[in-house]
């Protein structure tokens, strides 16, 4: 039996600024000698300090996700604290890593791209693929927590990945090469996983269900189910994507750990209750991907509307869109079933 895997993720704009702390954490974890468990480490970085610490990262086989938005113009929103362009330094460091540790680079390094008004899916994909032989993971800007006075500026910057991809003259080639990194294949995979009668998660699925399956409202994670994120101030969050107002507790070396499971359950259930009625009538409840903690004003006293709510007509369009995609791409079904869902 393969040993269980634990995952430690270092996530912030530039985690390498706190390298002594990272070393301390890893030394502590390694001193535990945990039986039957392999601990792996991951990090997201903009590569600014990569030249100083790449030896250590390669030694520990860090899973490294490098934030890069394409060529120099594409990447121009990423600047230093003094406002200077960071592209040349970032690229030089990534090039050095690839040259110095080619095997590590091939196995453990990937790229993350944020789409905005200075790049396109086409440009980013080709730049990173041609230079590094990697497929970037392309995402849109996070829409939560935007200040009211910055909303217009944000709207001008925002680009939808699926819409942008469809505008490319090489659309068909891109989605075929991107595969699960493309919104189309990602949606089809979820559609088949949830609604195809030929997908079985375990042997228990082979037995006929006598009653309808119950689903937890929304598509978010139950706290501590998948990961845990601790801020620099010691606040415990369910993950790095949600606001700090949804803190689960506090970890501070100078005081006792403040982590009440009952309070966490009460808070989580309170927010679920605010959406429960909508979830009961939502046609996407079986395959919901909406994290409730990313819904604006979830923590307010006002009544909220889930942006992922889907009525009968919208669901019909969702089914039609996925079926149409598989009709136009006859190999999509077999490819997803064999490569991803098998």
Tell where the protein language model's regions lie, with residue ranges.
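Conserved acidic functional residues
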Residues: 69, 227, 235, 240
